Regions:
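Flexible, acidic glycine-rich loops studded with aromatic residues
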Residues: 84-92, 98-239
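Short tryptophan-centered beta-strand motifs in secreted/extracellular beta-sheet-rich domains
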Residues: 259-261, 310-319, 324-328
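Flexible glycan-contacting loops in extracellular carbohydrate-active proteins
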Residues: 334
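Short, aromatic/His-centered strand-loop micro-motif at the edge of beta-sheets
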Residues: 292-314
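Short strand-turn-strand beta-turns centered on an Asx-Gly dipeptide
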Residues: 297, 327-331
Length: 334
């Protein structure tokens, strides 16, 4: 397809070689860790000549990144792309995501080390309607370990299963999901898998206790991407009257938030701001339509509501990681 590299053209290798060199060589390389993931996944297997080219491409870039002292990582695809062209397996780390693409038993037999990342358990695709919006952390905590690769179950602590991970795929741009929304999906998954990587099947703390305790753990020292203020819901800022240029002293207030204010509207020019933070701007009159709206992550989101001059209203805006709602005089507008 148009989004695939043409494996039959020498120019493809020239381009990808140069790309990896740009990231791997020189005095200040981008990739400084021990491993480099070369990708290689989801090519059609309808034509055997394509399969053989795919296998040759995979083998080439395994050896290419090894030439920079890196361990190569690949996506599991070699059951789907079954062929005669040899692909190096020694000291290669394979992401085992779907057993139909890479049979984990066969891959282990061939000598690959595996990272367990079965898509049916560990794929997040935010607000897409397929895979998970949020991982089922309770099921993962109670039932899953890296030894469970899809429906295949291996002995715990198998020497060729090096661990597990989850994935977030942002398949749909412009669907309202922000980087903050993704963070709220990622962090509980990260906390849960961290425990599972450490304890395996030997979790002794009940899930309810773990789930409660994890909420009190900060993201990292000095880090608060979620914008939490304390651990309990409470009012964090009250003011009788707002004046232009006033600052709250708060960087941000994370989900689940409620902002309420009374307003007597005037005719506003398009682009008139009401609130601003490092992450978003809320408009009384957005730059495009003159309606209430907000911009974040480069996207303008507009409510189908516009104040008329001299209108008085009580306005409430609520937000969580799935939606932002507008209430006028206590009634949900959008």
């Amino acid at each position: 397809g148009m989004d695939h590299l043409d494996l039959f053209k020498p120019e493809t290798y020239e381009f990808v070689d140069a790309l990896f060199r740009e990231y791997l060589e020189g005095r200040n390389p981008v990739f400084t860790g021990k491993r480099v993931h070369i990708g290689t996944d989801e090519y059609s297997n309808k034509k055997q000549d394509v399969v053989e080219k795919f296998r040759a491409f995979t083998d080439h870039y395994i050896r290419f990144v090894e030439g920079f002292g890196k361990q190569a990582c690949v996506w599991g695809a070699l059951t789907h792309a079954k062929g005669e062209t040899p692909v190096k397996s020694e000291n290669v780390l394979m992401s085992a995501w779907y057993n139909g693409y890479a049979d984990p038993k066969e891959m282990i037999k061939q000598g690959y080390d595996l990272i367990s990342i079965p898509d049916g358990y560990l794929y997040i695709v935010p607000a897409a309607g397929y895979y998970y919006d949020y991982l089922n952390t309770e099921m993962l905590y109670k039932e899953w370990t890296p030894a469970h690769v899809g429906k295949e179950v291996f002995p715990e602590k198998h020497k060729q299963i090096k661990g597990g991970m989850f994935a977030v795929w942002n398949d749909h741009a412009g669907n309202g999901i922000s980087t903050k929304d993704i963070h709220y999906r990622v962090f509980p998954a990260m906390q849960t898998l961290a425990v599972k990587m450490w304890t395996g099947k030997d979790c002794t703390v009940p899930y309810a206790d773990f789930n409660s305790a994890r909420m009190a753990i900060s993201e990292a020292p000095g880090v608060n991407v979620a914008g939490r203020i304390g651990t309990e819901p409470r009012s964090v800022y009250n003011l009788e009257t707002l004046k232009p240029g006033m600052e709250t002293g708060l960087k941000e207030i994370g989900y689940h938030y409620t902002v309420s204010f009374d307003i007597k509207a005037e005719a506003e020019e398009k682009g008139t701001e009401l609130f601003r933070s490092p992450d978003a701007v809320f408009y009384l009159s957005d730059p495009a339509s003159g309606k209430l709206g907000f911009i974040r992550d480069g996207y303008l989101n507009t409510f189908n509501y516009q104040f008329y001059p001299e209108e008085t209203a009580s306005v409430t805006i609520t937000g969580d990681e799935k939606s932002t709602r507008l209430y006028i005089d206590g009634k949900l507008k959008e």
